[in-house]
Structures are given as C-alpha cells and as structure tokens.
Swiss-Prot record:
Any one biological process term the GO annotation gives: protein refolding
HAMAP family: CH60
One of the record's GO molecular function terms: unfolded protein binding
Family stated for the protein in its record: Belongs to the chaperonin (HSP60) family.
Name listed for the protein in its UniProt record: Chaperonin GroEL 1
The UniProt record lists the keyword Transmembrane helix: no
EC annotation from Swiss-Prot or TrEMBL: 5.6.1.7
Gene this protein is translated from: groEL1
Subcellular location: Cytoplasm
Catalytic activity as recorded in UniProt: ATP + H2O + a folded polypeptide = ADP + phosphate + an unfolded polypeptide
Enzyme class per UniProt: isomerase
Naturally occurring in which organism (per UniProt): Prochlorococcus marinus (strain MIT 9515)
Positions bound to ATP: 29-32, 86-90, 413, 492
Annotated function: Together with its co-chaperonin GroES, plays an essential role in assisting protein folding. The GroEL-GroES system forms a nano-cage that allows encapsulation of the non-native substrate proteins and provides a physical environment optimized to promote and accelerate protein folding.
C-alpha cells in the first residue's frame, strides 16, 4: 500500500489537528456538569456516553496523518482506563494542552528534546508533591469518591459504598444489566483470581475485551492439556448440552487450544480456557478451592484421574464467569454455600497450626477470596440506551473507588493540581531556557482540568482559576461556590491523577519530538459494478453450485484422520462450523 509522508512542522501540525479533534469531543465529559456524547451504532440504538475512552475510540479522521494524532491521544485515554479505570478525560485534557503549548514553543525555535526533558523533570516534581498530599481513605470517604466519580450521582455512590462495605477489599464487585427499572445490589458466593483468557479469540465483548459465560460448565484440572484426544469425550457431551464451557487447567496449549479457538469462532462451542492461578502446591490448593465453590471434581494426576474419563457429572457450574486478559471472576450458585463455609473453617484451622508466617499469609489470602463473596450491582433503567449509559458510569465510579483504596485521595476538582502548579512556578530556574520552558508547560497544563470543569458548568475558566488562587479555596462546580473541597467531600483518587499525568506527558513528549509521520494513503472506493449509470441489479448471474456436503466440522470428533475434530485440510470443502465439533476443512 502506498504511503503518505509528512515532515517537520507539517507533521506535528497534522498530528495536533488529530489531537485537538479528539480532545474537543472528549473534554465535554469532565466534571459534575459534564455533557453527554451520542455515538451512532450500525445496529441497535445509539449509545449515550460520558466516558473519555469510549468517545476517543469511536473517532476516525479522513486525513491519515491527523488520524495518527487522534489514535495517539486515544492511546492515552485507553492506557489510563486500563491502568486506573478512570481519569481518561483528565489525561486527554492534559495531553492536548501540553501538545499545544509545546508546538508553539517549537515553532518559536525551542528544542523539542530539551522541552521533553523539561516536561519529564516537571512531571517528577509533580508526582513527588502529589504523593505528599495524598491521604488514606476511610469508610465514610468511599461514598464521597464514588459519588464524585459518578458525576455527582448519589444513588451510584451509595450502592458502591454498600457493596464495598459488605464484601470488603478482598471481595469482588461486578456490574451487570437488570431486567427491572431499579438498580439493585445482590450479594452471592464467588471469587476472582489473577489469570485471564488463554487466547484473545475467546473474547465475547470486543468493546470491553472480556469473555462472558452465562451458566457455564467448568472443567478443573491440575494437568496440562496439549492434545485433542483428552478432550474429545467431554467436548461431545458439552456440545449435546449446548452449555457454555470453561477449561481451567495448569496450562492449555498447542492442538487443544487451537481446536477450542476455532470451534469457538465457528460457533460450534461457546468455550474459553484459563490457566490455573498460583504455582506449585499452592496452585493445586487454589484449584481445590475453586472446585468446592463451583461443585466440580478436581481432575488430578495425584489420584490417577484421566481427562478422557471425565463425564459431565464431574464438571462444576456457575451463574456467570467474566474473564478479562488478566483476571477471572466467578459468580457461584448458592447451593455450594455450606461447602464453602466448611472449607473456610478448615483453612482457619490450618492457619492456627501453621508456623511459617509466609504460609499463614497465603492461607489467609485464600480465606479472604472464598469468604469475601461477590457483590452484583444489577443496573436497571427504562431504556436500553439509559442502561448502557448508567452501567458505564457505575463501572467508572467503581474503578475510581478501588484506586482510592489503593493509593489514597487528594482534593478533587483539580484543586490539588492547581496547588502543585503554584509550587512548581516558584521553584528555581534551570540553566537551559528550553528546559525551563518544558517545566512551564507542565505548570500551565495542571490548571487546565479545573478550567474545563468550570467551562462545562457555564463559568469562565480563567476567572475561576484567578478566584481559586485569590480565595485559597476550591471550586465546587455543582453549586458554583468556592469551598474547602475536602470538607465538601469532593475527592479524587491519587492513583487516577498520577496515571493521567504520566500517560499524558509520555504521549505529548512523543508528539513534540516527532519529525516524520508516515501513514497509509486511503485506497479509492471501487466503482459500482457495470460502471456509471449501470443498472445496480444487473449482471448478477446465477448462483454457483453448492457442491457436496463436505462442510468443515460435519463429522464426529477425533484426531486428524478420524473424521471430525482434526487439523485443517482433512476433509471436504465448505463453510466452517456448520456441523459437529471441528476444525476448518474437516469431514
């Protein structure tokens, strides 16, 4: 494909255009008086969102170089979302102002490299001061943080606070859609562990990059699975039951993993695979815990149990399993509650007789995972569009609350950044003029989130900043008053602010030091068949013959050469996944 090249100031200006386009669309979503963004969908109703990352992902520009800038700032939002779960709009706003100020100075003759060094030096100072201002969160602050992160929605703040109080920091909180109009909180058995899907091809929700299995059957084993032979009998039973299926094993690889992926993508099986958590003996113990939670039988080598002998009665079950790239959450049925309690009591007795402090800590971690349970926030709304909107707000708020528990909180509304900006401007100057300019770029950027919060609330951002400095109070955009924001309960998670700063400086510095941009030249759209003025329905001809019924996956299950589940190219030609379990091209 031919490439379009752009050099020097031209490349940076085009990148800036892309940055500005995305940032201008995103920054209306910050603060308690934020505005919504409506996103068209090819199928179904439009989405109404107030989330920076979601908006940024949807934007594609005609100019290839500008589109690179759009994708770079989308990366800022996505990375901040992935790491902190919130703060995407703040990161986007910071990136935009840094790029704008940096390019102004480069056009005036400043060295991009020296500016980058100055920005990085300024960032280091800001992060030190941010850490010193952070305070640990207490119980009453959880609801305040959740409410602020939900755009001032007190109902959401209250629900998240109750959920955190019930399951504690060791429990799991999940968000799902409800059939009712009300948003409800439900506590059930369950747990999570730090392992994700074995292949991204198992993803069922592309936008959120997760795999969700409703009422799945679960195979749990401490064995490695690499060949298809071991799985064939149980896969045949699963296909007959039409149940979703999760394989939780020490490892799953090679032919076995490939076969599961292909049958998943061809629609033959709704399946996923996850590696077992922990290591060594602790891995087996963790699998035993999960087996008890789900009512499964642990298929263990120690008991001379073979995978090919597994029946559907040996499998566990769950209400729902959600798998991301690095985490698995199991929502269990209540019928295993007594077994879980007995398991917890057994583990507590183990703690009492264990001498090693390290071993005690590990057993206590297992107790916390089993006993913590899962809090289900069931989101209700009058319409599907409202439900999706509300669900996104709750997820953002939940992520912000978790971040606050991890690293503490600071004064919200951008107030802490304004204080640090003042302190930064009073520091001694560096020898290099451009290095100083880089620090000044950071100093100015720290004011921008508050300015935008004020603009979204209908106030002049510059006037608000001046009043904040004069009165030495924060700006409450909810009521337009200047207050002590800590006392007003307006708090921001330190982790969210830290990651927004780090990610924005990283991308802004890369854009400022770019000298050449290379992008694909879009190919012209192909003309309509028959040329201009031709009948669009003409020339369709007859349909080709269907040939034989040698469609892939039509046969039974087995290894290559056995008829059904085999490697590609083993049988007749046809569409994948039309029949039984199989790989493409199997008979």
């Amino acid at each position: 494909m031919p490439k379009q090249l752009s050099f020097s100031n031209d490349s940076r200006e085009a990148l800036e255009n892309g940055v500005n386009t995305v940032a201008n669309a995103v920054k209306v979503t910050i603060g308690p008086k934020a505005k919504n963004v409506v996103i068209e969908r090819k199928f179904g109703s439009p989405d109404i969102v107030r989330d920076g990352s979601t908006v940024a992902k949807e934007i594609n520009l005609d100019n290839p170089i500008s589109n690179l800038g759009a994708k770079l700032i989308e990366q800022v939002a996505s990375k901040t979302k992935e790491s902190a779960g919130d703060g995407t709009t703040t990161a986007t706003i910071l990136t935009q102002i840094m790029v704008q100020e940096g390019l102004k100075n480069i056009a005036a003759g400043a060295s991009p490299i020296e500016l980058k060094k100055g920005m990085e030096k300024g960032l280091d100072i800001v992060l030190e001061k941010l850490k010193s201002k952070s305070i640990k969160i207490n119980g009453s602050d959880i609801q305040k943080v959740a409410t602020v992160s939900a755009g001032g929605d007190e109902e959401i703040g209250s629900i998240i606070s109750k959920a955190m109080d019930i399951v504690t920091s060791d429990g799991v909180i999940t968000v799902e859609e409800s059939q009712s109009l009300e948003t409800e909180l439900d506590i059930t058995e369950g747990m999570s562990f730090d392992r994700g899907y074995s292949s991204p091809y198992f993803v069922t929700d592309q936008e959120r990059q997760i795999c969700e299995l409703e009422n799945p059957k679960i195979l749990i084993t401490d064995q490695k699975i690499s060949t298809l032979t071991n799985l064939v009998p149980i896969l045949e039973e699963i296909q007959k039951s039409s149940s979703p299926f999760l394989v939780l094993a020490e490892d799953i690889e090679g032919e076995a993993l490939t076969t599961l992926v292909l049958n998943k993508n061809s629609g033959v099986l709704n399946v996923s695979a996850v590696r077992a958590p922990s290591f060594g003996e602790r891995r087996k113990a963790a699998l035993e815990d999960i087996a008890i939670l789900t009512g499964a039988r642990l298929i263990s080598e120690d008991q001379s149990m073979k995978l090919e002998e597994v029946t559907i009665n040996d499998l566990g079950k769950a209400k729902k399993i959600t798998i991301s790239k690095d985490k698995t959450t199991i929502v269990a049925f209540d019928d295993t509650k007594d077994l879980v309690k007995a398991r917890v009591e057994k583990l507590k007795r183990e703690v009492e007789i264990t001498e090693s402090e390290y071993d005690k800590d590990k057993i206590n971690e297992r107790i916390a995972k089993l006993a913590g349970g899962v809090a289900l926030i069931k989101v209700g709304a009058a319409t599907e569009t409202e439900m999706k909107y509300k669900k996104l707000r709750i997820e953002d708020s939940l992520n912000a609350t978790k971040a606050a528990i991890e690293e503490g909180v600071v004064s919200g509304g951008g107030q802490t950044l304004i204080e640090i900006s003042e302190e930064l401007s009073n520091l001694g100057k560096e020898k290099s003029v451009d290095l100083n300019t880089g620090i000044k770029i950071i100093t100015k950027a720290l004011l921008e989130p508050t300015k935008q919060i004020a603009r979204n609330a209908g106030f002049n951002g510059d006037v608000v900043i001046a009043d904040i400095k004069r009165l030495n109070k924060g700006f409450n955009a909810n009521n337009g008053q200047y207050e002590n924001l800590n006392q007003s309960g307006i708090l921001d998670p330190t982790k969210v602010i830290r990651l927004a700063l780090q990610d924005s400086v990283s991308i802004a510095a890369m854009i400022l030091t770019t000298e050449v941009a290379v992008a694909d030249i879009p190919e012209p759209e192909a003309p309509a068949p028959g040329g201009p003025g031709a009948d669009p329905m003409g020339g369709m001809g007859g349909m080709g013959g269907m040939g034989g019924m040698g469609m892939p996956g039509m046969g039974g299950m087995g290894m290559p050469g056995m008829g059904g589940m085999g490697m590609p190219g083993m049988g007749g030609m046809g569409m994948p996944g039309m029949g039984g379990m199989g790989m493409p091209g199997m008979m």
